[in-house]
């Protein structure tokens, strides 16, 4: 902008005077070269401190939740993009309870770099404040309470006949309650130790966590990510004989609650072609953690948009709940969290192999596969100002006019050195508008409750959540979850003490046993 203003000013003043003087015409070319060189120097001077440091020294990455089973995918993505994202060092951070996994994953991560042509050191720490100073990018992929907390999030609602799921319904709200205070404390550390860094969040529920960073953390350099759009864009094109390069995707909505349209290389909409392909048994990129029951075709053709996989919990609620309850009641299967525990065990046994220096195929069994690759592309696009088209959670700014301009939405965006620039989607139809407005207001209540610890605000969120049948059972589920997660909900300490005095106990045997063991 400054360069443009300088050029316009010179066009109005200096150049006319030069050209009016015939004796100085020969100096015009020389002057122009001097001007261009000056503008180049001005651009260098205008580079922010963090840009100059990154370009000179390479990039420092800090990953909080570094002991995650997804970390090898993160390393793979960074190695693949090293030419455009020259990393000088990586720090993997975790907590004491995750120390063993951190050490296993850390050794594997270093093996992956050692097997590459690049000399990158992977540092491990249980103290994020040791890692954060000078960071250029901070990625977050942690789970407060580990998988045992997820199991309680699932089993307690199921014990009352309601959905128990990681990011939807009661479980999703309680995951946010545990996570938001932690992400805000991370932001406070970043303000002190790496104030110029970007925060790239893929800790679930990504939408509420990212929005809380912006709203309550007052931190604008944040982008939230999800693997669901990535999976759709990887698998849908081939169902109509196209490649992703030939198609343009437009997403709009919220994290785990968005829709998209698709256009071909000629600008013609092909959304209905993909919808028709959905009913021919073709792979549509549905995440591994979602039961694949088909949507009603008539509904999709009417909306002329493709819902994300998580919409099955809303559009086919009856069938999805029945499937979840069937697994919950089968001791040989268990909830998704219990299944993931087994998958995680298998993955970490693989990661221990001193000869393994690449991401194993078994990682695809985890529902969050491709999260990390999306994060690497986002970071590379910010660093190199690539203006890549990526679906992210960012500030709305009018992209979805049915929602407040300052709320967080998950939309198609161009990602560059200034962050995410959301692409306008336009108004939604009445049915989708009603859904998304209800979900957004539920999210806002959850975020407020996470920060304030207000019981009434949380109850409001429970009552308006479409996955919860409002009434006595809903309140009981909420109370049991508060007791189950006492260790991670200090903001609700007074409420939890009251519930314990009233004799509230946990109905589900597994969840109760985990709680009694302090897990």
Q: What residue ranges belong to the model's regions?
A:
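N-terminal Rossmann-like dinucleotide-binding module
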Residues: 60-86, 90-93
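Long, compositionally biased stretches enriched for glycine and/or charged residues
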Residues: 241-519
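Rossmann-fold dinucleotide-binding core
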Residues: 72, 198, 202-267
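Glycine-rich phosphate-binding loop and adjoining beta1-alpha1-beta2 segment
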Residues: 83-116
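A structured beta-alpha segment of the ubiquitous adenosine-cofactor-binding alpha/beta core
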Residues: 111-136, 144, 163-169, 179-194
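Hydrophobic alpha-helical signal peptides and transmembrane signal-/tail-anchor segments
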Residues: 30-43
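Short, solvent-exposed beta-strand-terminating loops
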Residues: 137-157
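Rossmann-fold NAD(P)-binding glycine/threonine-rich loop
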Residues: 152-194, 198-215
């Amino acid at each position: 902008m400054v360069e443009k203003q300088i050029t316009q000013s010179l066009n109005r003043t200096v150049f006319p005077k030069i050209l009016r003087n015939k004796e100085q015409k020969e100096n015009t070319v020389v002057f122009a070269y001097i001007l261009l060189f000056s503008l180049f120097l001005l651009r260098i001077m205008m580079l922010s401190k963090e840009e100059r440091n990154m370009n000179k020294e390479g990039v420092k990455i800090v990953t909080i939740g570094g002991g995650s089973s997804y970390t090898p995918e993160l390393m793979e993505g960074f190695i693949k993009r090293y030419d455009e994202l020259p990393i000088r060092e990586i720090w993997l951070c975790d907590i004491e309870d995750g120390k063993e996994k951190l050490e296993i994953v850390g050794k594997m991560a270093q093996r992956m770099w050692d097997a590459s042509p690049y000399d990158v050191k992977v540092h491990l720490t249980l103290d994020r404040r040791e890692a954060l100073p000078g960071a250029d990018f901070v990625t977050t992929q942690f789970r407060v309470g580990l998988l045992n907390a997820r199991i309680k999030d699932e089993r307690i609602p199921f014990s009352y006949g309601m959905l128990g799921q990681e990011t939807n319904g009661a479980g999703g709200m309680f995951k946010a309650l545990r996570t938001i205070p932690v992400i805000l404390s991370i932001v406070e550390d970043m303000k002190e130790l790496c104030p110029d860094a970007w925060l790239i969040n893929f800790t679930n529920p990504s939408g509420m966590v990212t929005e809380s960073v912006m709203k309550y953390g007052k931190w604008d350099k944040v982008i939230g990510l999800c693997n669901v759009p990535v999976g759709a864009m990887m698998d849908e094109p081939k169902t109509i004989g196209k490649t992703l390069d030939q198609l343009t995707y437009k997403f709009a909505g919220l994290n785990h609650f968005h829709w998209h349209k698709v256009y071909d290389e000629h600008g013609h909409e092909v959304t209905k072609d993909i919808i028709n392909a959905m009913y021919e048994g073709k792979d549509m990129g549905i995440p591994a953690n979602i039961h694949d029951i088909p949507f009603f075709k008539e509904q999709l053709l009417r909306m002329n948009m493709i819902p994300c996989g998580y919409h099955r919990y809303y559009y086919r609620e009856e069938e999805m709940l029945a499937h979840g309850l069937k697994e919950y009641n089968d001791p040989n299967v268990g909830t998704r969290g219990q299944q993931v525990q087994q998958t995680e065990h298998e993955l970490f046994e693989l990661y221990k192999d001193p000869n393994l220096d690449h991401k194993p195929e078994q990682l695809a069994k985890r529902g969050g596969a491709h999260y990390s690759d999306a994060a690497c592309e986002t970071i590379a696009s910010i660093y190199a100002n690539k203006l890549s088209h990526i679906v992210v959670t960012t500030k709305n700014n009018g992209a979805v006019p049915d929602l407040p301009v300052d709320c967080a939405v998950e939309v198609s965006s161009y990602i560059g050195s200034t962050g995410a620039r959301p692409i306008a989607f336009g108004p939604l139809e009445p049915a989708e508008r009603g859904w998304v407005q209800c979900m957004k207001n539920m999210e806002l209540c959850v975020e407020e409750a996470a920060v304030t610890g207000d019981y009434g605000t949380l109850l409001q969120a429970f009552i308006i959540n479409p996955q919860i049948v409002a009434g006595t059972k809903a309140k009981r589920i909420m109370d049991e979850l508060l007791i189950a997660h006492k260790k991670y909900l200090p903001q609700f300490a007074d409420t939890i003490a009251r519930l314990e005095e009233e004799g509230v106990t946990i109905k589900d045997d597994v969840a109760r046993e985990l709680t009694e063991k302090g897990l």
